[in-house]
Amino acid sequence: MAEVGLLPFARVALQVATQVLPPYRTRFSKHQFTQPQLLAVLCLMRYEDWTFREAETRLREHQELRAALKLREVPDYTTLYRFLRRLDDVTVERGLGETVRRLRRRRRRAVSVAIDGTGLSYNSVSTFFIRRLEQHADRSARHRHWLKWVIVVDVQQQILLAQRAHQGPGSDVRSLPGLLDVAARGAPIRLVLADAEFDSEPNHQHIRQRLGAKSIIPAKRRGIPQGTIRNQMFRAFPEKPYRQRAKIETIFSAIKRKLSSRAPGRSLSIQIRQALLLGLAYNLYRLRHPLIWKDVNRAINT
Protein backbone atom coordinates (compact mmCIF):
# COMPACT_ATOMS: atom_id res chain seq x y z
CA MET A 1 0.00 0.00 0.00
CA ALA A 2 1.20 3.50 -0.82
CA GLU A 3 2.28 5.71 2.05
CA VAL A 4 1.06 9.11 0.85
CA GLY A 5 -2.43 10.57 1.20
CA LEU A 6 -5.28 9.46 -1.00
CA LEU A 7 -6.74 12.93 -1.46
CA PRO A 8 -3.73 14.61 -3.15
CA PHE A 9 -3.30 11.58 -5.41
CA ALA A 10 -7.00 11.55 -6.31
CA ARG A 11 -6.93 15.25 -7.21
CA VAL A 12 -3.89 15.02 -9.47
CA ALA A 13 -5.20 11.80 -11.07
CA LEU A 14 -8.46 13.56 -11.93
CA GLN A 15 -6.58 16.56 -13.35
CA VAL A 16 -4.47 14.34 -15.63
CA ALA A 17 -7.46 12.20 -16.66
CA THR A 18 -9.41 15.34 -17.58
CA GLN A 19 -6.62 16.32 -19.99
CA VAL A 20 -6.69 13.02 -21.91
CA LEU A 21 -10.38 12.02 -21.95
CA PRO A 22 -13.61 13.82 -22.88
CA PRO A 23 -16.29 13.89 -20.19
CA TYR A 24 -18.49 11.34 -21.94
CA ARG A 25 -17.92 8.73 -24.60
CA THR A 26 -20.97 9.70 -26.69
CA ARG A 27 -23.81 12.20 -26.34
CA PHE A 28 -26.07 9.26 -25.46
CA SER A 29 -23.95 8.20 -22.47
CA LYS A 30 -25.43 8.27 -18.98
CA HIS A 31 -24.29 11.46 -17.26
CA GLN A 32 -23.83 9.65 -13.97
CA PHE A 33 -20.01 9.47 -14.01
CA THR A 34 -17.52 11.12 -16.33
CA GLN A 35 -14.77 9.17 -18.06
CA PRO A 36 -12.02 11.14 -16.24
CA GLN A 37 -13.62 10.27 -12.90
CA LEU A 38 -13.63 6.55 -13.71
CA LEU A 39 -10.04 6.64 -14.99
CA ALA A 40 -8.96 8.43 -11.81
CA VAL A 41 -10.63 5.70 -9.73
CA LEU A 42 -8.79 3.01 -11.73
CA CYS A 43 -5.49 4.79 -11.06
CA LEU A 44 -6.41 5.01 -7.39
CA MET A 45 -7.05 1.25 -7.40
CA ARG A 46 -3.57 0.63 -8.77
CA TYR A 47 -2.08 3.09 -6.30
CA GLU A 48 -3.66 1.32 -3.32
CA ASP A 49 -3.77 -2.18 -4.89
CA TRP A 50 -7.54 -2.39 -4.38
CA THR A 51 -9.88 -4.87 -6.03
CA PHE A 52 -13.02 -3.58 -7.75
CA ARG A 53 -15.19 -4.43 -4.75
CA GLU A 54 -12.69 -2.84 -2.36
CA ALA A 55 -12.71 0.34 -4.44
CA GLU A 56 -16.50 0.55 -4.24
CA THR A 57 -16.43 -0.01 -0.47
CA ARG A 58 -13.67 2.54 0.18
CA LEU A 59 -15.37 5.21 -1.92
CA ARG A 60 -18.63 4.62 -0.10
CA GLU A 61 -16.88 5.02 3.26
CA HIS A 62 -14.71 8.03 2.36
CA GLN A 63 -16.74 11.20 1.78
CA GLU A 64 -13.68 13.43 1.32
CA LEU A 65 -12.30 11.07 -1.32
CA ARG A 66 -15.58 11.24 -3.24
CA ALA A 67 -15.39 15.03 -3.02
CA ALA A 68 -11.81 15.04 -4.35
CA LEU A 69 -12.99 12.98 -7.34
CA LYS A 70 -16.14 15.14 -7.67
CA LEU A 71 -18.35 12.05 -7.39
CA ARG A 72 -22.00 12.61 -6.51
CA GLU A 73 -22.57 8.85 -6.34
CA VAL A 74 -20.39 5.79 -5.80
CA PRO A 75 -19.71 3.77 -8.97
CA ASP A 76 -20.63 0.11 -8.73
CA TYR A 77 -17.73 -2.33 -9.08
CA THR A 78 -19.23 -3.60 -12.35
CA THR A 79 -19.19 -0.03 -13.72
CA LEU A 80 -15.47 0.19 -12.99
CA TYR A 81 -14.81 -3.19 -14.60
CA ARG A 82 -16.77 -2.34 -17.75
CA PHE A 83 -14.89 0.95 -18.07
CA LEU A 84 -11.56 -0.90 -17.71
CA ARG A 85 -12.58 -3.24 -20.53
CA ARG A 86 -13.43 -0.27 -22.78
CA LEU A 87 -10.28 1.65 -21.91
CA ASP A 88 -7.68 1.47 -24.68
CA ASP A 89 -3.91 1.46 -24.39
CA VAL A 90 -3.62 4.71 -26.35
CA THR A 91 -5.53 6.58 -23.64
CA VAL A 92 -3.22 5.24 -20.94
CA GLU A 93 -0.24 6.24 -23.10
CA ARG A 94 -1.62 9.77 -23.43
CA GLY A 95 -2.07 9.88 -19.66
CA LEU A 96 1.52 8.81 -19.14
CA GLY A 97 2.65 11.49 -21.60
CA GLU A 98 0.70 14.14 -19.69
CA THR A 99 2.40 13.13 -16.42
CA VAL A 100 5.81 13.32 -18.13
CA ARG A 101 4.99 16.82 -19.39
CA ARG A 102 4.03 17.92 -15.87
CA LEU A 103 7.02 16.28 -14.22
CA ARG A 104 9.50 17.78 -16.68
CA ARG A 105 7.76 21.17 -16.74
CA ARG A 106 9.91 23.37 -18.98
CA ARG A 107 13.05 21.28 -18.93
CA ARG A 108 14.57 20.85 -22.37
CA ARG A 109 17.77 19.00 -21.55
CA ALA A 110 18.34 15.62 -23.16
CA VAL A 111 18.06 12.70 -20.76
CA SER A 112 19.75 9.38 -20.11
CA VAL A 113 17.26 6.51 -20.23
CA ALA A 114 17.30 2.86 -19.23
CA ILE A 115 15.07 0.10 -20.55
CA ASP A 116 14.32 -3.18 -18.82
CA GLY A 117 11.51 -5.58 -17.98
CA THR A 118 10.12 -7.30 -14.92
CA GLY A 119 7.49 -9.91 -14.17
CA LEU A 120 4.10 -9.14 -12.63
CA SER A 121 1.81 -11.71 -11.05
CA TYR A 122 -1.76 -11.91 -12.35
CA ASN A 123 -3.16 -13.25 -9.07
CA SER A 124 -2.74 -12.82 -5.34
CA VAL A 125 -0.74 -16.00 -4.80
CA SER A 126 2.77 -15.21 -3.57
CA THR A 127 5.75 -16.26 -5.69
CA PHE A 128 7.09 -18.08 -2.61
CA PHE A 129 3.96 -20.28 -2.52
CA ILE A 130 4.21 -20.94 -6.27
CA ARG A 131 7.84 -22.06 -5.93
CA ARG A 132 6.89 -24.37 -3.04
CA LEU A 133 4.21 -25.95 -5.21
CA GLU A 134 6.71 -26.43 -8.04
CA GLN A 135 9.05 -28.31 -5.73
CA HIS A 136 6.38 -30.98 -5.22
CA ALA A 137 4.95 -31.00 -8.75
CA ASP A 138 6.04 -32.75 -11.92
CA ARG A 139 7.50 -30.80 -14.85
CA SER A 140 4.14 -30.52 -16.64
CA ALA A 141 2.60 -28.70 -13.68
CA ARG A 142 5.19 -25.94 -13.41
CA HIS A 143 4.10 -22.29 -13.37
CA ARG A 144 5.32 -21.18 -16.80
CA HIS A 145 3.56 -17.93 -17.64
CA TRP A 146 3.41 -14.47 -16.14
CA LEU A 147 2.97 -10.93 -17.37
CA LYS A 148 6.13 -9.19 -18.55
CA TRP A 149 6.21 -5.41 -18.15
CA VAL A 150 8.86 -3.44 -20.06
CA ILE A 151 9.50 0.22 -19.26
CA VAL A 152 11.76 3.09 -20.34
CA VAL A 153 12.78 5.46 -17.54
CA ASP A 154 14.66 8.73 -17.15
CA VAL A 155 17.46 7.59 -14.82
CA GLN A 156 18.05 11.08 -13.38
CA GLN A 157 14.47 12.05 -12.62
CA GLN A 158 13.33 8.42 -12.19
CA ILE A 159 10.06 8.67 -14.08
CA LEU A 160 8.49 6.42 -16.70
CA LEU A 161 8.66 7.66 -20.29
CA ALA A 162 7.22 4.63 -22.11
CA GLN A 163 5.92 1.14 -21.35
CA ARG A 164 4.42 -2.03 -22.81
CA ALA A 165 3.27 -5.37 -21.41
CA HIS A 166 2.82 -8.86 -22.83
CA GLN A 167 2.65 -12.46 -21.69
CA GLY A 168 6.02 -13.82 -20.59
CA PRO A 169 8.45 -15.36 -20.99
CA GLY A 170 9.70 -13.88 -24.24
CA SER A 171 12.40 -11.71 -25.77
CA ASP A 172 11.86 -7.95 -26.06
CA VAL A 173 14.80 -7.17 -28.34
CA ARG A 174 12.47 -6.04 -31.15
CA SER A 175 10.39 -3.82 -28.89
CA LEU A 176 13.26 -1.43 -28.10
CA PRO A 177 12.92 0.89 -31.17
CA GLY A 178 9.20 1.46 -30.69
CA LEU A 179 9.48 2.08 -26.96
CA LEU A 180 12.33 4.54 -27.42
CA ASP A 181 10.42 6.41 -30.14
CA VAL A 182 7.54 6.89 -27.69
CA ALA A 183 9.94 7.95 -24.92
CA ALA A 184 11.64 10.47 -27.24
CA ARG A 185 8.32 12.27 -27.74
CA GLY A 186 8.31 13.10 -24.03
CA ALA A 187 11.99 14.00 -23.66
CA PRO A 188 14.99 14.22 -26.03
CA ILE A 189 17.35 11.29 -25.44
CA ARG A 190 21.14 11.50 -25.30
CA LEU A 191 22.05 8.07 -23.83
CA VAL A 192 20.33 4.66 -23.81
CA LEU A 193 21.29 1.97 -21.29
CA ALA A 194 20.05 -1.60 -21.66
CA ASP A 195 21.12 -5.09 -20.66
CA ALA A 196 22.20 -7.88 -23.00
CA GLU A 197 18.60 -8.93 -23.69
CA PHE A 198 18.32 -5.92 -26.04
CA ASP A 199 21.67 -6.52 -27.75
CA SER A 200 21.45 -6.29 -31.54
CA GLU A 201 23.15 -4.23 -34.23
CA PRO A 202 19.82 -2.83 -35.54
CA ASN A 203 19.00 -1.57 -32.04
CA HIS A 204 22.35 0.23 -31.80
CA GLN A 205 21.82 1.74 -35.25
CA HIS A 206 18.29 2.90 -34.41
CA ILE A 207 19.50 4.65 -31.26
CA ARG A 208 22.49 6.31 -32.90
CA GLN A 209 21.09 7.15 -36.34
CA ARG A 210 17.38 7.70 -35.70
CA LEU A 211 17.52 9.23 -32.21
CA GLY A 212 21.00 10.76 -32.38
CA ALA A 213 21.85 9.26 -28.98
CA LYS A 214 24.63 7.10 -27.60
CA SER A 215 23.88 3.45 -26.87
CA ILE A 216 25.48 1.25 -24.20
CA ILE A 217 24.31 -2.36 -24.44
CA PRO A 218 26.64 -5.23 -23.45
CA ALA A 219 27.22 -7.78 -26.20
CA LYS A 220 26.06 -11.31 -25.51
CA ARG A 221 28.92 -13.64 -24.62
CA ARG A 222 28.83 -15.93 -27.63
CA GLY A 223 32.18 -15.45 -29.24
CA ILE A 224 33.17 -12.28 -31.08
CA PRO A 225 29.92 -10.48 -31.99
CA GLN A 226 29.10 -9.43 -35.53
CA GLY A 227 28.44 -5.78 -36.30
CA THR A 228 30.65 -2.73 -35.86
CA ILE A 229 28.96 -1.28 -32.77
CA ARG A 230 28.48 -4.64 -31.05
CA ASN A 231 32.15 -5.37 -31.62
CA GLN A 232 33.05 -2.03 -30.01
CA MET A 233 30.90 -2.90 -26.99
CA PHE A 234 32.64 -6.28 -26.74
CA ARG A 235 36.19 -4.91 -26.93
CA ALA A 236 35.90 -1.67 -24.91
CA PHE A 237 32.74 -1.64 -22.82
CA PRO A 238 32.12 1.70 -20.99
CA GLU A 239 31.58 0.38 -17.47
CA LYS A 240 31.29 3.68 -15.57
CA PRO A 241 28.33 5.29 -17.41
CA TYR A 242 26.61 1.89 -17.59
CA ARG A 243 26.31 1.80 -13.79
CA GLN A 244 23.40 4.25 -14.02
CA ARG A 245 21.29 1.42 -15.44
CA ALA A 246 20.93 0.05 -11.89
CA LYS A 247 18.47 2.88 -11.15
CA ILE A 248 15.79 1.13 -13.18
CA GLU A 249 16.00 -1.75 -10.69
CA THR A 250 15.43 0.84 -7.94
CA ILE A 251 12.26 1.95 -9.72
CA PHE A 252 10.97 -1.61 -10.09
CA SER A 253 11.63 -2.20 -6.40
CA ALA A 254 9.84 1.00 -5.39
CA ILE A 255 6.79 0.20 -7.51
CA LYS A 256 6.45 -3.33 -6.17
CA ARG A 257 6.96 -2.28 -2.55
CA LYS A 258 4.95 0.94 -2.48
CA LEU A 259 2.22 0.27 -5.06
CA SER A 260 1.77 -3.30 -6.32
CA SER A 261 3.56 -6.29 -7.81
CA ARG A 262 0.41 -7.58 -9.53
CA ALA A 263 -1.45 -7.09 -12.78
CA PRO A 264 -4.74 -8.78 -11.81
CA GLY A 265 -7.24 -10.01 -14.36
CA ARG A 266 -8.71 -13.17 -15.83
CA SER A 267 -7.93 -12.25 -19.43
CA LEU A 268 -4.59 -11.23 -20.90
CA SER A 269 -5.99 -7.93 -22.22
CA ILE A 270 -7.14 -6.91 -18.72
CA GLN A 271 -3.79 -7.91 -17.21
CA ILE A 272 -1.95 -5.79 -19.78
CA ARG A 273 -4.18 -2.79 -19.06
CA GLN A 274 -3.63 -3.22 -15.32
CA ALA A 275 0.14 -3.19 -15.87
CA LEU A 276 -0.05 -0.01 -17.95
CA LEU A 277 -2.24 1.64 -15.31
CA LEU A 278 0.37 0.69 -12.72
CA GLY A 279 2.96 2.69 -14.68
CA LEU A 280 0.59 5.65 -14.91
CA ALA A 281 -0.13 5.43 -11.16
CA TYR A 282 3.61 5.47 -10.44
CA ASN A 283 4.11 8.72 -12.38
CA LEU A 284 1.10 10.22 -10.60
CA TYR A 285 2.72 9.16 -7.34
CA ARG A 286 5.89 10.95 -8.43
CA LEU A 287 3.93 14.11 -9.12
CA ARG A 288 3.00 14.12 -5.43
CA HIS A 289 6.47 13.34 -4.04
CA PRO A 290 9.30 15.07 -5.98
CA LEU A 291 11.30 15.89 -2.83
CA ILE A 292 11.47 12.29 -1.62
CA TRP A 293 12.97 11.22 -4.93
CA LYS A 294 15.54 14.01 -4.91
CA ASP A 295 16.81 12.54 -1.64
CA VAL A 296 16.85 9.03 -3.15
CA ASN A 297 18.84 10.23 -6.18
CA ARG A 298 21.31 12.03 -3.92
CA ALA A 299 21.82 8.90 -1.82
CA ILE A 300 22.37 6.70 -4.89
CA ASN A 301 24.87 9.09 -6.47
CA THR A 302 27.02 9.44 -3.33
What is the meaning of each model-derived region?
Residues 53-69:
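DNA-recognition alpha helix
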Residues 2-47:
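Basic, short loop/linker segments at the boundary and entry of helix-turn-helix/winged-helix-like folds
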Residues 238-302:
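Basic, amphipathic alpha-helical segments enriched in Lys/Arg and hydrophobic/aromatic residues
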Residues 30-31, 35, 47, 82, ...:
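Polybasic low-complexity intrinsically disordered regions
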